[in-house]
């Protein structure tokens, strides 16, 4: 089976998901697709191009909604699609947040364009659209990385677990609000939290337009 850029990027994404970006190398990707490292340069220019390509792959997993739908529905569909794709590949979110990668492909740009189109259709100016777009990305990145951190097994060792410390310190007399809300904080759901934020954002955009 002949090698192409898509197969290289798919292999790189699987490797990054399994081992993290720090472990991603041209040599390891080459081994994953069964070729010598030099053969990869027929399909990707360098590691930066590789990172951009696998990031674009994640954006391309998102379906672009019908532009005839109301803008609120389009924003929600795109945001939920991006959340689901990012949650499958949180390693890419880390690369985006660190500005180590950019989604460089026509398919990825169509997703971004569709989101901006929906925001413009909300009646926002170009400047407000840019702010809303950045706000949504910040929500996406934060929610996905928070969820991913919750699943990490290896954490810094402490004499007292963080949860136990908060419960011990948050007494009704000293920290009454923290004491009251702490059980809800400890039982949070990242997906529900993201939907809550998204509802606030869409509601706020509707009021601002």
Where are the regions that the model predicts?
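Helix-turn-helix
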Residues: 7, 11-49, 53
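Hydrophobic alpha-helical connector segments
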Residues: 63-110, 126, 133
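Amphipathic alpha-helical interaction segments
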Residues: 7, 49, 77, 110, ...
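Amphipathic alpha-helical packing segments from all-alpha helical-bundle domains
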Residues: 97-123, 127-134, 145, 167-176
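Hydrophobic, amphipathic alpha-helical faces that serve as interaction scaffolds
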Residues: 91-92, 141, 145
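C-terminal peripheral helix-coil segments that are non-catalytic and often amphipathic
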Residues: 121, 149-209
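Short, basic, alpha-helical segments at the C-terminal edge of helix-turn-helix-like DNA-binding modules
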Residues: 55-61
């Amino acid at each position: 089976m002949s090698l192409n850029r898509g197969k290289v990027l798919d292999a790189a994404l699987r490797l990054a998901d399994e081992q993290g970006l720090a472990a991603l190398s041209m040599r390891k990707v080459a081994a994953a697709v069964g070729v010598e490292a030099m053969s990869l340069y027929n399909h990707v220019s360098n590691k930066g191009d590789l990172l951009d390509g696998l990031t674009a792959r994640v954006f391309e997993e998102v379906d672009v909604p019908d532009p005839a739908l109301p803008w609120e529905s389009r924003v929600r569909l795109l945001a939920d699609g991006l959340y689901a794709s990012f949650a499958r590949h949180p390693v890419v979110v880390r690369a985006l947040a660190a500005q180590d990668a950019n989604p460089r492909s026509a398919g990825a740009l169509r997703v971004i364009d569709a989101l901006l189109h929906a925001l413009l259709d909300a009646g926002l100016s170009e400047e407000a659209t840019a702010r809303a777009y950045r706000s949504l990305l910040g929500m996406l990145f934060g929610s996905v990385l928070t969820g991913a951190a919750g699943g990490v097994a290896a954490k810094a060792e402490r004499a007292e677990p963080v949860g136990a410390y908060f419960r011990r310190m948050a007494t009704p007399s000293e920290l009454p609000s923290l004491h009251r809300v702490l059980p809800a904080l400890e039982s949070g759901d990242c997906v529900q939290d993201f939907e809550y934020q998204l509802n606030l954002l869409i509601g706020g955009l509707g009021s601002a337009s």
